[in-house]
Amino acid sequence: MLKPLALATILLVAASSYCQKASEKSKRFKGMYFQWGYNKEWYTKSNLRFSLSNGDKFTVHKVKAHDSPDLDAIINVPTQISIPQYSYRIGFYLNKTKTKAIELNFDHIKYIATDYQTARVSGVYNGKIIDEQKLLDPQNFLHLEHTDGGNLMHINYVQIHHLLEKKATTKPLLNAIWKVGAGFNIPRTDVTWKGEQFNNQFHIAGYNISAEAGARYYFLKNIFFETTAKTGFVHYVNALANTAANKGNKVEHHFGYFELIGTVGFDINW
């Protein structure tokens, strides 16, 4: 959780410094914005394809999964703002009317394969070819989650449409907004294999594409609330599935998702 948050801080400082130089020299960007908020997800079923260091290769078919918003953590530990499923955006306006932007878009999502569901398992398991129904029991079989983050980092193109403007000014009051983008995944995968739990390291492990749409409301001059709905596709190509005793394990899977996001943001003008 801390690494993505630290990355957000570094990127914000770097982006601000870069944009100040850009505004002085090339006038390439017409302003920038920063947003922070939280999200909620729903996932499609996914086939988990395991490749273990002992030679076993098997697939757990049509696995159900859920998220874990953990919004109560903000009340219980107010300083730990990165415990819940958070989202941040750093955007750069491309025109004076601020209707077009390029955006760095990050979602800290939590993907949890639901325990104690029965799923078909096929392939080589314990050195034998199998095709049978198994219970996803962490003590006797396995558990998988990306709860230190599925962590979707991508670049968006943003289009903004002014719906309402403040009286006697040309400042926006209410905007419609849509975004499309693609990027990469930085998961930290927590695996329990026959009762042995291990939280793997962060690493780049695949790609994602998405589309997002919603509304942005300016309740103060340069401060806004944005709510959007987002849908996309995520492919974890080589997520680590190691345990303390066994290294070199990988899991590959992909799924679709639907997400609701609420953020507060502010514009920086020059």
Roles of regions detected by a PLM:
Residues 26-34, 98-102, 170-178, 221-227, ...:
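Outer-envelope beta-barrel architecture signal
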Residues 28-32, 82-86, 147-153, 174, ...:
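Residues that define the transmembrane beta-barrel architecture of outer-membrane proteins
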Residues 46-52, 56-64, 214, 218-270:
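Predominantly the C-terminal beta-signal and adjacent terminal strand-loop region
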Residues 46-53, 115-121, 169, 188-197, ...:
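Outer-membrane beta-barrel translocator domains and adjoining extracellular loop/strand segments
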Residues 89-192, 263-268:
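Gram-negative (and chloroplast) outer-membrane scaffold detector with strong preference
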